[in-house]
């Protein structure tokens, strides 16, 4: 199952501020050369005041909305 824009996803990257948190996919880059093609938007901000981050498809788990 491919991850699409608007999907709810759980973050599996352990070093991420949002590890195990749920966010919404803001965009997906279809280019094969992109290492982190999925941009995810979160409700809360990190230490720098940022609420988006890019992740690889293998670092995400789609959850039921």
From Swiss-Prot:
<keyword id="KW-0997">Cell inner membrane</keyword>
<dbReference type="InterPro" id="IPR008990">
    <property type="entry name" value="Elect_transpt_acc-like_dom_sf"/>
</dbReference>
<keyword id="KW-1003">Cell membrane</keyword>
<keyword id="KW-0602">Photosynthesis</keyword>
<comment type="function">
    <text>Stabilizes the interaction between PsaC and the PSI core, assists the docking of the ferredoxin to PSI and interacts with ferredoxin-NADP oxidoreductase.</text>
</comment>
<dbReference type="GO" id="GO:0009538">
    <property type="term" value="C:photosystem I reaction center"/>
</dbReference>
<comment type="similarity">
    <text>Belongs to the PsaE family.</text>
</comment>
<comment type="subunit">
    <text>The G.violaceus PSI reaction center is composed of one copy each of PsaA,B,C,D,E,F,L,M and Z, and forms trimeric complexes.</text>
</comment>
<keyword id="KW-0603">Photosystem I</keyword>
<keyword id="KW-0472">Membrane</keyword>
<protein>
    <recommendedName>
        <fullName>Photosystem I reaction center subunit IV</fullName>
    </recommendedName>
</protein>
<dbReference type="GO" id="GO:0005886">
    <property type="term" value="C:plasma membrane"/>
</dbReference>
<dbReference type="Pfam" id="PF02427">
    <property type="entry name" value="PSI_PsaE"/>
</dbReference>
<dbReference type="InterPro" id="IPR003375">
    <property type="entry name" value="PSI_PsaE"/>
</dbReference>
<dbReference type="GO" id="GO:0015979">
    <property type="term" value="P:photosynthesis"/>
</dbReference>
